[in-house]
Amino acid sequence: MTVETIEATILGIFRNVLKNQDLGEDADFFEAGGDSLLAIDAIELIGQAVGRDLDSVLIFMFPTPESCAGAVADLG
């Protein structure tokens, strides 16, 4: 997957988990209403979408779709 595809996937997951279709690629998950439980849900969905087990702190360290996609892409 390209980083752009990963970013679009993560953005869609953030929008669905947070129930906010207006989020952009630079939206902070937590500033947009996310909490730790929703973050764990989102991390699991992202992992399923990219076919990897992801660290549970991913969104805490990279809270925007753009930064999160870069981190996931760097994992290979």
Regions flagged by a language model, labelled:
Residues 1-76:
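Phosphopantetheine-dependent thiolation modules in NRPS/PKS and related acyl-activating systems
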